[in-house]
């Protein structure tokens, strides 16, 4: 804001969004926020639809026959995680499936921690047939954890699961071509596409100062890797 720029795209800025908006307004500089969750009510924002992504992923697994679906990863302080877990829970309820709080496991974004966590989860609850992972790092760790536990991941229906396979689902912010070649179903909101949308939006704000602030929500897409 002190460099004479015509507009600013802000990534994140959780907790300081209001302050940045005030400073930008004083200088007449338009701001657009790239947010991971919905915490800036008064600002011009672009964010992924975390709840829709989780609903889509959970529903896909349910339609494949899974009824005992767990959650792995993220911290309870994360608003992104809260929105995703909300979508997961809402979908279980929609289909009349049980929600078990002990099946929602916090975990650092570490492959090692995720591998350990999924192993412990399945030892305590061996009938779980699918696990939704908070991000790609957690998913990779979970995949290694399944191998260590003598299990496999697979996208097939539950009728093919004879106590050895566990389906994995996960969230990603990269395009289909950049996803790991693992048997995981992904809910992806590509960061590159969001970047193009952000660039278009800031140019609109620069060219027309009367454009009102608004919220744009980008829906996720389902990608299966077999």
Report residues per predicted region.
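Alpha-helical recognition/docking segments in bacterial nutrient-uptake
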Residues: 1-59, 63, 123, 127
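Hinge/beta->alpha junction and helix N-cap segments in small-molecule ligand-binding domains
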Residues: 14, 45-56, 72-119, 132-141, ...
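Conserved H-loop
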Residues: 67, 98-100, 152
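Flexible loop/turn connectors
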Residues: 122-226
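Short beta-strand segments enriched in small/hydrophobic residues
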Residues: 7, 60, 68-75
């Amino acid at each position: 804001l002190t460099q004479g720029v015509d507009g600013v795209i802000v990534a994140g800025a959780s907790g300081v969004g209001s302050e940045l908006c005030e400073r930008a307004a004083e200088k007449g500089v338009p701001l657009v926020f790239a947010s991971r969750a919905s915490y800036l009510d008064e600002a011009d924002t672009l964010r992924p639809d975390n709840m829709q992504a989780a609903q889509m992923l959970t529903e896909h697994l349910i339609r494949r026959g899974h009824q005992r679906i767990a959650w792995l990863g993220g911290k309870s302080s994360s608003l992104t995680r809260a929105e995703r877990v909300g979508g997961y829970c809402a979908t279980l309820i929609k289909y009349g499936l049980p929600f078990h709080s002990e099946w929602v496991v916090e975990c650092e974004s570490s492959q090692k921690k995720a591998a350990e966590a999924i192993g412990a989860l399945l030892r305590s609850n061996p009938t779980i047939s699918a696990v939704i992972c908070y991000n790609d790092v957690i998913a990779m760790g979970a995949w290694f954890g399944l191998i260590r536990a003598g299990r496999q991941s697979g996208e097939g229906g539950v009728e093919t699961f004879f106590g050895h396979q566990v389906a994995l689902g996960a969230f990603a912010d990269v395009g289909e071509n950049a996803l790991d070649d693992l048997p995981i179903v992904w809910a992806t909101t590509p960061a590159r596409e969001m970047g193009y949308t952000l660039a278009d939006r800031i140019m609109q704000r620069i060219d027309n100062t009367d454009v009102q602030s608004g919220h744009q929500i980008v829906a996720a897409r389902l990608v299966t890797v077999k």
